[in-house]
Structure formats: structure tokens, C-alpha cells
Amino acid sequence: MKTNCEFPLLCLLIVLVANVEGEVEDNELKMVKRLWRNWEDPEQRQLLDQEAEQEKQREKRLWRNWEDLELRQLLNEFAENQREKRLWRNWERRQVANEDDGEKPKELWRNWEDLKRRQVVDLNDEQKTTG
């Protein structure tokens, strides 16, 4: 029989004291005696120890899972903060770039016009030399 009595001597003492005072029925005393016999039995004690060890391992695993979850949440919050900072910096850079945009398009347009003029001149020069 599997039991969860981790301290059989304490269980036995409580029942014996209660029995002396006449507060324990025979069924309870039989149960404690059975617990004690199970505890004295090496195989039964080994099973109880294994169950206790499995429960400890389960608790450790649950704790690690909880810690992992907490860590993941912290990392996600950190990543989100970093993403927000990066988006903000990019937005600020675009604002600064947009302030300069008044001259940039004009300069780009002038460069494009110059390029087209040079292409026309080069084309005319080619036609003169071949023609």
C-alpha cells in the first residue's frame, strides 16, 4: 500500500497519545500500524522514497518552467523596448532628413537635367563624328 506519511514515527506517536486518551478508534490505530509496517518494509520504504523524489523533481521542473517563463517575458519586454527605441530613432532620422528635403529634390532635379544635357551633347557629338 502506498502512503504519504513522511514521518511515520510522528504519526505513530500522535495516534498512540490519542489512543491513550481514548480519542482514536480502532480503524485509525490499524491504519497507523499499517503505515508503520509499510515504513519498516524496505521495498515499501524505497517506493515511498521514489515517490517523494519524483515529487521533488516535478516541483523543480515546474519551478524551472516558471523561471523560464519569467525570463522569456522579461526578454520579450526588453526586445519590445529596444524595438520601440529603434523605431523612434528611425522616425527622428526621417524627420531630420525631411527638414533637408527642400534642397535635396532641387539638387537631384538639377543633376538629372545636367545628365540629360550631357547625354544630348554626347549624342550630337557622336552624330557629327559618324555623319
Curated annotation (Swiss-Prot):
The modification Pyrrolidone carboxylic acid is found at Q95. Expressed by the venom gland. This is U-scoloptoxin-Er5e. It is found in: Secreted. Keywords: Cleavage on pair of basic residues, Pyrrolidone carboxylic acid, Repeat, Secreted, Signal, Toxin. Its main location: secreted. Residues 1-22 form the signal peptide. One of its GO terms (molecular function) is toxin activity. GO terms for cellular component: extracellular region. The keyword rRNA processing does not apply. RLWRNWE repeats lie at residues 34-40, 61-67, 86-92, 107-113. Belongs to the scoloptoxin-08 family. Residues 23-94, 112-131 form a propeptide.
